[in-house]
C-alpha cells in the first residue's frame, strides 16, 4: 500500500558550468522531474531542486580561454541551463547557484558546524592531479609527465593543504550498521 502525505526532496546534481548543458544533464533532470511529478500526483509534498556549481578550476580555466571573467561565464552558462529546463517543461521548485548569497550563507553555517564538530582535520595532500576529473590520479613514480587516461591531458603536480574527514571516528558505528540485515 502506498503511503500518501509524505515529504520528498528531490535534487539533480548541481551541474558544472564549465560547458553548456548536454544529454547527460537532460537525462538526469528529466528522470528527477518524472519522480517529482509522480509524487505530486500521489498527493505528496515535493521540493525539487536543480542548479549549477559555479566553483572549480576547470570553470576558471574555461572562462579564461574565452577571455571572460569567471562570473560572467557562469552567468551565461546558467542561463542556458534555465532555458533548456524551461523548454523541457521541467517542474523544478528551486534553481540553486553556488555563488548566490543564500547558498554561500548556508555553506558558511554548515562549515562552521563541521569545524566545531571535530569531524575534520587539516592535512597535506600531494600528487598528480587532473583538473578535468577534479581528482588525484595514481601514477607510476617513474613517469615524469603523466597523462590523464580520460582527458589525454598532462596531469599537474599538486601539494596542498586540505580538510580530511575523520571516518575512523565512526568505524564502530559503521561496522554495526553494516551488520544489520537489509541496511545495505
Functional labels for PLM-detected ranges:
Residues 4-184:
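N-terminal, positively charged nucleic-acid-binding surface of large information/translation enzymes
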Amino acid at each position: 500500500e502506498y503511503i500518501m502525505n509524505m515529504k520528498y526532496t528531490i535534487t539533480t546534481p548541481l551541474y558544472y558550468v564549465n560547458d553548456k548543458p548536454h544529454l547527460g544533464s537532460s537525462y538526469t533532470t528529466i528522470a528527477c522531474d518524472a519522480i517529482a511529478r509522480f509524487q505530486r500526483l500521489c498527493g505528496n509534498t515535493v521540493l525539487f531542486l536543480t542548479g549549477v556549481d559555479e566553483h572549480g578550476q576547470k570553470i576558471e580555466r574555461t572562462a579564461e580561454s574565452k577571455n571572460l571573467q569567471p562570473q560572467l561565464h557562469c552567468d551565461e552558462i546558467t542561463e542556458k541551463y534555465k532555458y533548456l529546463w524551461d523548454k523541457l517543461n521541467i517542474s523544478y521548485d528551486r534553481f540553486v547557484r553556488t555563488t548566490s548569497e543564500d547558498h554561500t550563507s548556508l555553506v558558511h553555517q554548515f562549515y562552521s558546524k563541521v569545524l566545531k564538530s571535530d569531524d575534520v582535520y587539516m592535512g597535506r595532500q600531494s600528487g598528480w592531479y587532473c583538473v578535468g576529473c577534479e581528482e588525484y590520479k595514481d601514477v607510476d613514480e617513474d613517469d615524469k609527465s603523466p597523462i590523464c587516461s580520460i582527458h589525454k591531458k598532462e596531469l599537474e603536480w599538486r601539494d596542498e593543504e586540505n580538510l580530511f574527514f575523520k571516518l575512523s571516528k565512526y568505524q564502530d558505528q559503521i561496522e554495526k550498521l553494516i551488520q544489520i540485515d537489509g541496511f545495505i
